[in-house]
Amino acid sequence: MNTKEIVNKYEFKFNKNLGQNFLIDESVLEDIIEGAEINKEDTVIEIGPGVGTLTKELLERAKEVYSIELDGDLIPILQEELKEYNNFTLIHKDALKIDFNELMENKDSIKLVANLPYYVTTPIISRLLTEKCDFKSLTIMIQKEVAERINAEPNCKEYGSLTVLVQYYCNTKIIRKVSPNSFIPRPKVDSIVIKLDRLSEPRVRVKSQKLFFNVVRSSFNMRRKTLWNSLKSLNIDKESMENAFERAGIDPKRRGETLSIEEFGKLSDCIYDIL
C-alpha cells in the first residue's frame, strides 16, 4: 500500500504540533533511496518514518533499520505494517533526546535517512555533527531555505554558521527539489533532498575546535558588522586581536560571510596562539 492508503486504512489524524508532512510522491522516494546508496552491509537509522513507506524500501536493502518516531499514534501502525521484517527496530522516542552515540555503538557502516519536521532540522544536524556521531552519510529531506544555507558558498546571503558547521565535517550534495504537492498535508514551503557525506577528517585542521566554532558563531551573530566589531564578543584585547588578524593575513574590515572555512581556521589558530 502507498502512504495515502495506509493513512486512510488506519484513519490517521495528522498532528500539527509535530509538523507532520508525509511524502506521497513515489519518484521522490526512489530518489531518496538511490541517493542514500543503501546496501546489505549498512545499518540505517531513520528519523521520522511516518507510516513506514520509505522504511519498507530501506528494510529491503539494508542489514538492519532503526526507526525513531515520536508520535505514539504512529507506533501501532508501524508495528503492524512492518511486522514481517526481522531486521526492524522501532524506537518510540524524541530524536532530540536520543543518545545517538549509544545507538550507533558496535555498529558498522551507519547511514542516516530522515524526513524531519522543519523545526528540528538544525538541532538534529548540529547534534549529529558536534557530538561526533560515527555515521557515513545523512540523506535528509529539509526545507529548501535550510538546504541552500547548508550548501552555500562564501559571499552570499545564505552562507552562515550552519554552512561552516556542516561543510567542516561533510561534503554536501543536493539530490533534488521537492514540491509541496509531494506531501500530505501540503506544506507551505518547498523542500530539498540533500545528502551529507561525512569526511574521514574535518575539512581543516585547527588547534581548537571550540575556539574555531566560537569565532565562526561570533562572526555571523551580527552579519552587517565587520569581523573586528563582531569578534569583540571574544573579549580579547585590541593589540592581541590586531596581531592575530595580521598573522592570519585577513583584513579585519571584512565581514564573516566573505571568509572561507580555511580562512576561519587560519584566523582561529592565530587567535589561539595569542591567548
From Swiss-Prot:
It holds the Pfam family RrnaAD. It catalyses: adenosine(1518)/adenosine(1519) in 16S rRNA + 4 S-adenosyl-L-methionine = N(6)-dimethyladenosine(1518)/N(6)-dimethyladenosine(1519) in 16S rRNA + 4 S-adenosyl-L-homocysteine + 4 H(+). It is found in: Cytoplasm. Its EC number is 2.1.1.182. S-adenosyl-L-methionine binds at residues 21, 23, 48, 69, 94, 115. HAMAP family: 16SrRNA_methyltr_A. Specifically dimethylates two adjacent adenosines (A1518 and A1519) in the loop of a conserved hairpin near the 3'-end of 16S rRNA in the 30S particle. May play a critical role in biogenesis of 30S subunits. NCBIfam families: ksgA. This is Ribosomal RNA small subunit methyltransferase A. It comes from Clostridium botulinum (strain ATCC 19397 / Type A).
